[in-house]
Amino acid sequence: MTFNEAYGYIIKILESYIEQNINDDSLISILSDIDCDVWNDKEPNDPATFDDLRTQLEKYKNEKDLYSENEILLGLRDFLILYKENYGYNLDNCINYISRK
C-alpha cells in the first residue's frame, strides 16, 4: 500500500476500535488530530501529530516506499506507544487491540 492507502487503513482500524470502545477519549482525540477530512484543504487538524504518525510508519516501508498490512500495524502500534509514553495518553487497550490483529 502507498502511504495514502496505509493512512486510510489506519483510519478504518481506529474507527472500528472506537465503535467498540466509545468512551476511549484518548484515541478519539488522536483520531481527531490526524483526520484529514474535516477541512476543505484535506490537511490534518494537527499536522505535528500527523507527522508523528508518518514518521513511525516510515520506519517500516519497503524499498519501493510501500507498506504491507503488518508493517502498517507495527507503525501504528509504535505511534500509539509514543503518544502513551511521551504525552500520557491512556492507550493500553488500543495498543493491545492493534497487537492482536
Map each language-model feature to its residues.
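Amphipathic alpha-helical binding modules
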Residues: A48, N70-K101
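N-terminal interaction modules that seed assembly of large macromolecular complexes
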Residues: N21-P47
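Short terminal alpha-helical segments
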Residues: F3-L31
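Short, low-complexity cationic-aromatic patches
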Residues: M1-E5, S68-E69
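Generic structural signal for hydrophobic core residues of well-folded globular domains
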Residues: I13-N21, I34, L57-Y60, F79, ...
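Charged, low-complexity interaction regions
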Residues: Y17-D25, D65-L66, Y83-D92
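Short, charged early-sequence alpha-helical segments and their helix-coil boundaries
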Residues: V38-E71
